[in-house]
Amino acid sequence: MNVQIFGTKKAQRYFKERRIKVQFIDLKEKEMSKGELTSVMQAVGGIDKLLNPKAKDEETLALIQHLTSSQRFDKLLENQQVLAEPIVRNGKKATVGYCPDVWGAWE
């Protein structure tokens, strides 16, 4: 299992308690690459599932809602502070939000 966690320590703790090695990436320090974001977007079913409706940057969030799909992706790539967290990847699978039931099925 090759697990990558973008975001919260709570998700990291879940895997640590089960002695599963993870790669933790703090989105405040290092943003997702275009390829990583594309992979996650395809795995979860689109950009809308990646957006955090309670994000502090309400202007960017509102703007993203009114752009074309390619513009939305580019804007999201530039402004990753509106992503819902945690984003957890395991190969081609991914989840957005705290999803221990799904992660348990990965084990």
What are these model-derived regions, one by one?
Residues 1-30:
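Local sequence-structure signature of Cys/Sec-based thiol-disulfide redox active-site neighborhoods
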Residues 30-107:
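Thiol/selenol-based redox catalytic cores and closely related redox-interacting motifs
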